[in-house]
Amino acid sequence: MINIRAARLEDISKISSVIAASWKTAYRGIVNDDYLNSLRSDHWVDFLDSGLGNNSVFSMVIENNQEVIGTAILKETENKCEVCLISLYLLPNKIGQGFGHIFYTGVETELKNKGFSNCILDVLENNKRAIRFYKAHGFIDTDIEIKAVLGECNYTCTILEKTL
């Protein structure tokens, strides 16, 4: 049974594990292997604990048979009607089975229910699979690029946006 819900503080460890596992698969060949190999399952625990604890970010999870298989992390922007999708990840063995579509659709519904009218995100420009996924869900390219530093390497990210 699929369930999409708001993340709870007790989910933080599992969420961090999902993100780490997903990064190691999704970004292999895109991000430096040394950086990916250095990621531990608890890499995001402090960020999540702080962000969820002080409400600077909010998170949702997707469960399959009561197992957390994916997570989305979001942050309200300065424009109170706009939200930034910081991340949307699934466990690697759940990718390509329709869970991503189900999860994104549920997240979008929740964002609309919260009163958001626009969503932005950044995606590594070489992450073609993610770009296809987001464009299939109505995101458009803004032609804005930002730089990201992961480990000691620089990467270019493309900003996508969607009217909800």
Task: Please state what every model-predicted region is.
Residues M1-N3:
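Extreme N-terminal starter segment of soluble prokaryotic enzymes
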Residues A6-I12, S16-K94, H101-G106, E110, ...:
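Acetyl-CoA-dependent GNAT
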Residues I95, K112, K135:
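Short polybasic/polar patches that bind polyanions
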